[in-house]
């Protein structure tokens, strides 16, 4: 079992456990150059809010600072944006789904920024 398969197995188990809780899920996906965050409905079929480093406003803000979005500063910005969008959609608390990625670096920065912006998990 290679690294990718192990990550996907961990992600699958996490999603099964979150589905049993019947709460909204904040899912994070990370690539070398970008980071994505989505809030799914409790049933898991609808995306209620999303934010990523591919959005025009985010790219414009990151162009002033550094790089495209593969860094902690970009992850912090996405964490704040997803929390704002989730609260606007009426979601106060979520279950955090790190998609098998380690809670470290960009994933941790996104989670902490979302918490600071008022999202509870």
UniProtKB/Swiss-Prot annotation:
Q: Which Gene3D superfamilies match?
A: 3.30.420.100
Q: GO cellular-component terms in the record?
A: cytosolic large ribosomal subunit
What Gene Ontology terms for biological process does this UniProt record contain? translation
Q: Enumerate the CDD domains for this protein.
A: Ribosomal_L18_L5e
How is the subunit organization of this protein annotated in UniProt?
A: Part of the 50S ribosomal subunit; part of the 5S rRNA/L5/L18/L25 subcomplex. Contacts the 5S and 23S rRNAs.
Q: Briefly, what is this protein's role? A: This is one of the proteins that bind and probably mediate the attachment of the 5S RNA into the large ribosomal subunit, where it forms part of the central protuberance.
**NCBIfam families in the cross-refs:** L18_bact
State the protein's name.
Large ribosomal subunit protein uL18
Q: Which organism is it from?
A: Burkholderia multivorans (strain ATCC 17616 / 249)
Q: Which gene encodes it?
A: rplR
